[in-house]
């Protein structure tokens, strides 16, 4: 069950960008990035949150989107009200090393949001050393 788990916290994303507030745009952006990275989408769900207090009924609202991959998953969360988004990419490396594909997917999505700043993290999952320690 070896794999690579990548996360990115994006700040300074323009709230007016459709990728921040329009589920169909975020969905097509994610699916195109998945395909371009050479990964396989097997399912997806994108949800736009309902406007409400304290921002008001016309305020832009965020989206949570998940793409199930044959190799694991992609999750995206947007907060246009604070110009932020988070990305989470996890790929299994059981039959093949998908690390390069995961990096390509994360980089493509970061580019789509055009953030002012990015905080990235990488976690190696299921190392042999961890398995031996059990």
Identify the residue ranges that each predicted region occupies.
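Polybasic/polar functional segments that serve as interface/processing modules
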Residues: 1-134
């Amino acid at each position: 069950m070896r794999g690579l788990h990548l996360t990115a916290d994006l700040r300074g994303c323009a709230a007016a960008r459709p990728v921040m507030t329009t589920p169909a745009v975020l969905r097509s952006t994610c699916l195109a990035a998945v395909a371009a990275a050479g990964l396989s989408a097997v399912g997806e769900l994108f949800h736009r949150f309902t406007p409400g207090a304290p921002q008001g009924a016309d305020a832009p609202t965020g989206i949570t989107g998940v793409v199930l991959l044959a190799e694991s998953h992609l999750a995206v969360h947007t907060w246009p009200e604070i110009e932020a988004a988070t990305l989470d990419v996890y790929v299994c490396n059981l039959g093949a090393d998908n690390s390069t594909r995961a990096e390509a997917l994360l980089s493509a999505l970061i580019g789509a949001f055009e953030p002012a700043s990015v905080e990235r993290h990488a976690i190696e999952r299921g190392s042999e050393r961890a398995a031996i320690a059990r």
